[in-house]
Design a protein with these regions (language model features):
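Intrinsically disordered, low-complexity boundary segments flanking structured domains
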Residues: 121-124, 228, 338-344
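Alpha-helix initiation and N-capping motif
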Residues: 178-182, 290, 344, 348
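Generic structural motif
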Residues: 142-144, 320-321, 358-360
Length: 361
């Protein structure tokens, strides 16, 4: 029995072919996990005819429901004429204290200040993180006179698996050898195990550690184009990737709004990945950010405002190297790419794993 057959037999109805996601994605600016979620609904089997039918259905859903920014006004018109319409968009929520209600904004549709039910925010707190959550939303339009807000969120469902039976995976693991399971895991992150040696497989899988361990501090530096950011941007709806220039203490930890303390990204996500970390080199990095970061990496907590906050988000630092390893070892060190402000024991001693990204071809 081939590995593919064993996977299909052990996880029937849960397997999605990675090549289908790439086939569907094209130039769409959406994470791969959004497409895999849809493929899982229509193409989770090994029957070629059924897969072909399901693939067409997924393409139809994307064509009809995914909101392209260029088509936003057309979609609004469709909602108005039909009265309601289902869309796929990135949704963010905020609390409007003046009106005492939560309000949503839609990244591609361009709508803001749309009332959103408290039940949706309570069950999906990441909506408040400021980074947005990809959702399937049924959006209604209210006709009539003297209507303050015409848009109405009738249903909202985040694009993520709600229930996972971990025990089932533990039981099915017994059906695989260690090497088979290793290759299976490599497949799940979109890589071909036949193109990697055993060490490269483990280096690639090490990128998953921040996803499965709370408060795991991870760093990977390596050449461009080796997939460092992919795992943190495309794989899971529970992690967030932010670029180097967008990192501030307020965004990561706590933002003060009057007398209120608004929790930052570490309070909502399982993994916060700092991309293009090396681009901060030569810039004046906020001293408050460095101090708060070091405290969080060490103690899983941070002090901002009047309170001490605890969080379980893993921190990941991803960046590119400019030189080869032999050059760095001879002329500087393996941390030469990162900002000078972070090259000190108080920061580096708190990194649990420095993944050698330069070994990935």
């Amino acid at each position: 029995m081939t590995l593919q057959q064993k996977i299909m037999n052990s996880f029937s109805g849960k397997v999605v072919r990675k090549d289908l996601a790439f086939l569907v994605k094209g130039g769409l600016p959406v994470p791969t996990y959004v497409l895999e979620y849809l493929l899982g609904q229509y193409c989770a089997n090994d029957d070629e005819e059924a897969i072909e039918i399901g693939l067409e259905k997924v393409k139809e859903v994307i064509q009809n429901n995914y909101v392209h920014r260029a088509d936003a006004e057309s979609v609004k018109g469709n909602i108005r004429e039909a009265g309601r319409y289902r869309i796929i968009d990135k949704v963010t929520a905020v609390l409007n204290e003046k009106s005492d209600e939560y309000q949503a904004s839609f990244a591609n549709l361009g709508l803001t200040n749309v009332p959103i039910g408290t039940q949706y925010v309570n069950s999906n707190p990441k909506l408040l993180s400021g980074n947005g959550v990809w959702c399937i939303v049924t959006l209604g339009y209210i006709h009539g006179e003297d209507i303050k807000v015409r848009w109405e969120i009738q249903t909202l469902k985040p694009i993520q698996i709600s229930n996972i039976d971990l025990q089932e995976y533990i039981e099915q693991r017994k059906n695989f050898t260690t090497d088979e399971w290793l290759d299976f895991m490599i497949h799940t992150i979109g890589l071909n195990p036949e193109m990697l040696n055993r060490r490269e497989k483990f280096i690639s899988l090490a990128r998953l550690l921040p996803h499965v361990e709370s408060n795991f501090n991870f760093m990977e530096l390596g050449p461009k184009g080796t997939g460092k950011s992919h795992v943190f941007q495309e794989l899971s709806p529970y992690g967030v990737l932010i670029s180097g220039g967008d990192v501030t203490s307020a965004r990561l930890f706590v933002k003060m709004q009057g007398n209120r303390e608004i929790l930052g990204l570490v309070g909502y996500w399982d993994v916060v990945a700092w991309d293009e970390f090396e681009q901060q080199k030569g810039r004046n990095v906020d001293a408050v950010l460095i101090d708060t970061m070091q405290n969080y990496l060490a103690n899983k907590s941070f002090n901002r405002g009047k309170a001490t906050h605890e969080a379980s988000a893993s921190m990941t630092f991803v960046g590119n190297t400019k030189h080869t390893v032999p050059y760095m070892l001879k002329n500087s060190h393996l941390f030469e790419s990162i900002p000078t402000s972070f090259i000190k024991g108080a920061f580096l001693d708190r990194i649990h794993l420095y993944n050698p990204g330069w070994e990935i071809r």
